[in-house]
């Protein structure tokens, strides 16, 4: 069985409340996590809620990273979804745990697009976001 991607669902408990309530720090952390994982960042959007909390997304050529924080509980929910073979979502997860000074974390990995075929014609990543994957046209 082949899969098109890996989706990490992480829960970070007892985080540094100031770190996960600082929209600039959260944005910088997610962008750097994507880069450490080997992904190509193509966009981002973050929002700080009043009185506290941050939500954000980093769009990568290989899929996305998202975060939703509850500083009042020291909690953050993080998704790292990557496609292709050159990105390591666990590197992003490990980096984010460190940056947010997480005391306890859980992570679940889900394989996405599990296909029962001998070989994948194409595994998304890189320039394939546009539908042009070298000599293969997608869509």
Swiss-Prot record:
The record marks 62-63 as: Cleavage (non-hydrolytic). The modification Pyruvic acid (Ser) is found at residue 63. The keyword GTP-binding does not apply. GO terms for molecular function: adenosylmethionine decarboxylase activity. Pathway: Amine and polyamine biosynthesis; S-adenosylmethioninamine biosynthesis; S-adenosylmethioninamine from S-adenosyl-L-methionine: step 1/1. NCBIfam families: SAM_DCase_Bsu. Heterotetramer of two alpha and two beta chains arranged as a dimer of alpha/beta heterodimers. This is S-adenosylmethionine decarboxylase proenzyme. The lineage of its organism: Bacteria, Pseudomonadati, Campylobacterota, Epsilonproteobacteria, Nautiliales.
